[in-house]
């Protein structure tokens, strides 16, 4: 009754009665009640983890612990509960040899996205299209997250680069202060009357000696054909030509290559278009 739901204890009992603490609140009447019940049942650690999993898809358990600055066992407990509630989903890469914990990576589900969208008071569909999170949407193969999963090794590699930067950040030394993942990094611009788009593998901000430097990451695994590489670099060149930057504000393009030979290939391609 309304009287019973007055105050925190009543809401807590209601969320428990619809099964929000053990699962995805299956006894809730409709999706709005389901999201409301899960929001009450979630812990503060779960809410933080859900946002990280949405912003940075395909992180492992230990990588989530690094991002959240928590112990692995704390993250594991939050993951187990969130998976049971249908907010987080485990993904195993296509080249994985076994089902060890390090092979399993995690993504936000559609239900998790609906919960975050409701908290921001934004329709879920609009949030899925324009928000900073990538999540499993329906059963199709379209969408930001589905693309990242298809490019599993590439996505995981780019994530690892930023995570290594984060782990090696030192007080007084170079420090990674900002990271926008590939799912949250799209630059649209106009060059010579033509609309163009750049999609780096992430954006970072490094601070050293009080100076901030932004960069775009291109994680090059050496598998891209030269024609594709040239076309990608040409978009960056067009962006730089069409913009005026104040001192120190120009974002640097950082291409990480797997071998010295591939680095030579990238340099020659850059010289051809810049």
What are these regions (language model features)?
Residues 55-67:
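Short acidic, hydrophobic short linear motifs in intrinsically disordered regions
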Residues 44-51:
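Pre-recognition alpha-helix immediately N-terminal to the DNA-recognition helix
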Residues 1-36, 40-44, 85, 117-274:
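Electrostatic, structured charged patches in enzyme active sites and in nucleic-acid/phosphate-binding
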Residues 92-131:
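Accessory beta->alpha helical hairpin/"wing" motif in late/C-terminal subdomains of nucleic-acid enzymes
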Residues 69-84:
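Short amphipathic alpha-helical interaction segments
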Residues 51, 62, 80:
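Residues within the helices of the helix-turn-helix
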Residues 56-59, 95, 113, 186, ...:
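Short, solvent-exposed loop/turn segments at secondary-structure junctions
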């Amino acid at each position: 009754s309304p009287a019973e739901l007055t105050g925190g204890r009543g809401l807590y009992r209601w969320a428990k009665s619809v099964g929000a603490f053990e699962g995805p609140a299956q006894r809730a009447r409709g999706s709005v009640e389901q999201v409301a019940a899960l929001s009450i049942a979630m812990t503060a650690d779960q809410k933080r983890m859900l946002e990280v999993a949405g912003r940075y898809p395909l992180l492992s358990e230990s990588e989530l612990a690094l991002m959240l600055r928590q112990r692995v066992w704390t993250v594991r407990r939050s993951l187990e509960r969130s998976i049971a509630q249908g907010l987080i989903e485990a993904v195993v890469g296509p080249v994985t040899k076994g089902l060890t914990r390090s092979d399993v990576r995690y993504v936000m589900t559609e239900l998790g996205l609906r919960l975050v969208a409701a908290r921001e008071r934004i329709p879920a569909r609009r949030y899925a299209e324009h928000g900073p999170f990538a999540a499993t949407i329906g059963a199709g193969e379209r969408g930001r997250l589905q693309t990242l999963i298809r490019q599993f090794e590439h996505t995981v590699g780019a994530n690892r680069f930023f995570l290594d930067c984060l782990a090696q950040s030192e007080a007084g030394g170079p420090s990674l202060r900002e990271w926008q993942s590939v799912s949250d990094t799209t630059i649209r611009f106009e060059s010579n009357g033509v609309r163009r788009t750049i999609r780096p593998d992430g954006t970072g901000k490094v601070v050293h000696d009080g100076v901030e430097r932004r960069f775009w990451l291109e994680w090059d695994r050496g598998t891209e054909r030269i024609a594709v590489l040239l076309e990608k670099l040409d978009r960056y060149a067009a962006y730089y030509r069409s913009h005026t930057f104040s001192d120190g504000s120009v974002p640097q393009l950082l291409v990480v290559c797997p071998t010295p030979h591939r680095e030579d290939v990238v340099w020659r391609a850059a010289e051809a278009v810049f």
